[in-house]
């Protein structure tokens, strides 16, 4: 049972008693409603408030209306949409799964929730910060940045406010500005890829997004389980990534367009690295090893190409390369590699 492992306690270590809370972004029991009571008991013992978001796998497979399919979830965790405040930030939880039974569903926010959210928005002071947590993402970046129609209406209702969507569902990690004043944080899985694989299928380490508010300022950073908070990048030597055999390749999994990723060769600044889209080399090697062992690979285990990779081609005489990534908040992360070594 996942929450009886150290994972939840590692996430929450240092948070208890420090004005913190956890938001679980859905698919809490993965089509196993008999686990709701046990999961709720584990949440209750964690020492911080835990706010639930309903996912498509939290619906009752034996029901054929959305209302009936969410009854078991609501019995254990309460309403599927609600709001709460922390600090100066207003948090709204929504259900953006319209369930039709037998695992068939639409990713939309129903009219009742949209009206409720719009009425909530009207009561907020101008320029408020609002975080909307829901399961499916508002925008699908891999489908030409297609935005959910009901999310467009939601953004219109919160125009004039600082709006953040916090979402899950995709098993990917990304931070995108959808429109002026609106950012979506689509968070990777804390369990790797569906508990089967040690990292997510886009190459993001298993972990969680940590949002902070301090003195009214709002920031975020990704925390990889079992790693120092300072570990935010992964660098490969030339020859380790087949698509870029002569290049140093860096992965920056919490990247957004406000980051800078630069490189140094033997201490000399060489400028910005080139962003590219790749299947993650580590994840691909993991899947290849499973195939070699005769394991059948499901479609949700296939590597997912992602655009948070960066390349630079060092000179033939270079002895060392350092990659430095700086996030939008000015935090600096670096990794050095000695050329000629592949360990």
Which role fits each region the language model picked out?
Residues 33-126, 145-166, 172-214, 218-221:
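Extended active-site neighborhood of metal-dependent phosphoesterases/phosphodiesterases
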Residues 338-343:
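Short beta-strand edge segments in extracellular beta-sheet folds
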């Amino acid at each position: 049972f996942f929450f009886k492992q150290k994972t939840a306690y590692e996430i929450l270590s240092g948070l208890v008693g420090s004005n913190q809370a956890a938001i679980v972004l859905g698919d809490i029991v993965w089509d196993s409603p008999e686990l709701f009571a046990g999961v709720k008991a584990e949440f209750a013992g964690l020492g911080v408030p835990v706010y639930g978001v309903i996912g498509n796998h939290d619906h009752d497979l034996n029901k054929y209306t959305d209302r009936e399919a969410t009854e078991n979830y609501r019995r254990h965790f309460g309403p599927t949409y609600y709001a709460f405040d922390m600090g100066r930030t207003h948090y709204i939880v929504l259900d953006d799964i319209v369930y039709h039974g037998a695992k068939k569903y639409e990713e939309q926010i129903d009219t009742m929730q949209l009206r409720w959210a719009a009425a909530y928005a009207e009561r907020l002071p101008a320029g408020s910060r609002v975080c909307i947590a829901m399961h499916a993402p508002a925008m699908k970046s891999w489908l030409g940045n297609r935005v959910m129609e009901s999310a467009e209406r939601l953004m219109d209702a919160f125009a004039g406010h600082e709006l953040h969507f916090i979402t899950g569902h995709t098993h990917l990690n990304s931070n995108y500005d959808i429109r002026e004043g609106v950012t979506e944080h689509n968070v990777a899985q804390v369990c790797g890829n569906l508990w089967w694989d040690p990292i997510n299928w886009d190459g993001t380490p298993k972990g969680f997004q940590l949002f902070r508010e301090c003195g009214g300022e709002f920031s975020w950073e990704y925390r990889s389980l079992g790693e120092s908070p300072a570990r935010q990048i992964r660098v490969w030597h030339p020859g380790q990534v087949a698509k870029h055999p002569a290049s140093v390749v860096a992965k920056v999994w919490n990247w957004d367009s406000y980051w800078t990723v630069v490189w140094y060769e033997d201490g000399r600044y060489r400028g910005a690295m080139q962003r590219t889209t790749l299947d993650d080399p580590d994840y691909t090697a993991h899947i290849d090893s499973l195939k070699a062992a005769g394991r059948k690979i499901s479609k949700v285990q296939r590597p997912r190409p992602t655009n948070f990779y960066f390349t630079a081609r060092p000179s033939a005489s270079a002895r060392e390369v350092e990659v430095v990534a700086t996030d939008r908040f000015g935090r600096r992360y670096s990794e050095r590699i000695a050329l000629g070594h592949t360990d």
